[in-house]
Each structure stands twice: as structure tokens, then as C-alpha cells.
UniProtKB/Swiss-Prot annotation:
Keyword Lipoprotein attached: yes
Keywords recorded for this protein, A-Z: ER-Golgi transport, Golgi apparatus, GTP-binding, Lipoprotein, Myristate, Nucleotide-binding, Protein transport, Transport
Cross-referenced NCBIfam families: small_GTP
Lineage of the species this protein comes from: Eukaryota, Metazoa, Chordata, Craniata, Vertebrata
Signal peptide segment: none
This protein's name: ADP-ribosylation factor 5
Family of the protein in this entry: Belongs to the small GTPase superfamily. Arf family.
Function: GTP-binding protein involved in protein trafficking; may modulate vesicle budding and uncoating within the Golgi apparatus.
């Protein structure tokens, strides 16, 4: 009986944990997003070789966010971070029309991995402040997301430097986690 009451109490009042893997091509804004969420400010970043990991608490959920470098030479290492991932944040530079196909290919490759089959997908359509940025509907089309039938996904327009859209994305992740 004591365990049951304790379990109910922690379920109602305790923080839920969610492991998030944040990936995308190099220079998409992953590290800027991570530290904007963690610190509430913009930090000077350098290309990530390896990973950054931070805990972001939001709406009674403790997100452990793994930000993994996106240079083409280190993308094969992404698979080492797949295990136990509940949410996948794929960051796309919405202004980089020349590499959107490359983003689509990398995303589709990842989504075929068995270890990520249960992970929800949040796409951050970043750099929306740029004049040539693709809108959500265009990016959704170019990434081929409509073809994803057996996966829960969402595209959120963001601007990491201003912080716009980031918490809307976390709201969506929080909602999806609460349904599980």
C-alpha cells in the first residue's frame, strides 16, 4: 500500500524525465538552441565536435538534451546516442535551401533505425528571422514528413537567437510525453 501511494504521489507531483536527442546538419543552430533553453541567453558557439548535454527543466519535466555535432564526418556517430531516446529534435536551417535535401536524407536515415522507432519527432525549423527562410509547410514537404505514417511528429518554426518557438516545441514534447 505504501508503495502505491508513493508511486501515485510521485506521478502527480514528481518531475518526469525525458531523454532528448538533438541533431541536424552543422550550423543549423542546435547548440544555440540548447543554451538558449538552458540559460535563457545566447552564447558564443563553435562547431560541436562530439556532444553537449544539459538538463532543461520545463513544466515539471526534466529534459536531458543531448546536442550532437552535425558535421558530415561525425554524423555516423549519431547512432551511439539513439538508445533510450524518447524524443528526437531535428534542427533544420530554414534559410539553407541548398542543403535541405541533405537534411531530408539524414533524417530519413535516422528514422529507419530500430532504436528510434518509439521516439517522437520534433523538427525545429530554425532561423525563421532570415528573409529567405522556408515556411513550415514548405519545409514539411521538402523533408518528406507527410509520408511518416507510424510516427508522431511536429514541425515548429523557431528563431534560436530570439528564442521564438522554442518553448512551443517543448510544450508539444511535454504533451506527447504525458500521453505515454
Amino acid at each position: 500500500m505504501g508503495l502505491t501511494v508513493s508511486a501515485i504521489f510521485s506521478r502527480i507531483f514528481g518531475k518526469k524525465q525525458m531523454r532528448i536527442l538533438m541533431v541536424g546538419l552543422d550550423a543549423a543552430g542546435k547548440t544555440t538552441i540548447l543554451y538558449k533553453l538552458k540559460l535563457g541567453e545566447i552564447v558564443t558557439t563553435i562547431p560541436t565536435i562530439g556532444f553537449n548535454v544539459e538538463t532543461v527543466e520545463y513544466k515539471n519535466i526534466c529534459f536531458t538534451v543531448w546536442d550532437v555535432g552535425g558535421q558530415d564526418k561525425i554524423r555516423p556517430l549519431w547512432r551511439h546516442y539513439f538508445q533510450n531516446t524518447q524524443g528526437l529534435i531535428f534542427v533544420v536551417d530554414s534559410n539553407d535551401r541548398e542543403r535541405v535535401q541533405e537534411s531530408a536524407e539524414e533524417l530519413q536515415k535516422m528514422l529507419q533505425e530500430d532504436e528510434l522507432r518509439d521516439a517522437v519527432l520534433l523538427v525545429f525549423a530554425n532561423k525563421q528571422d532570415m528573409p529567405n527562410a522556408m515556411v513550415v509547410s514548405e519545409l514539411t514537404d521538402k523533408l518528406g514528413l507527410q509520408a511518416l505514417r507510424s510516427r508522431t511528429w511536429y514541425v515548429q518554426a523557431t528563431c534560436a537567437t530570439q528564442g521564438t518557438g522554442l518553448y512551443d516545441g517543448l510544450d508539444w514534447l511535454s504533451h506527447e510525453l504525458s500521453k505515454r
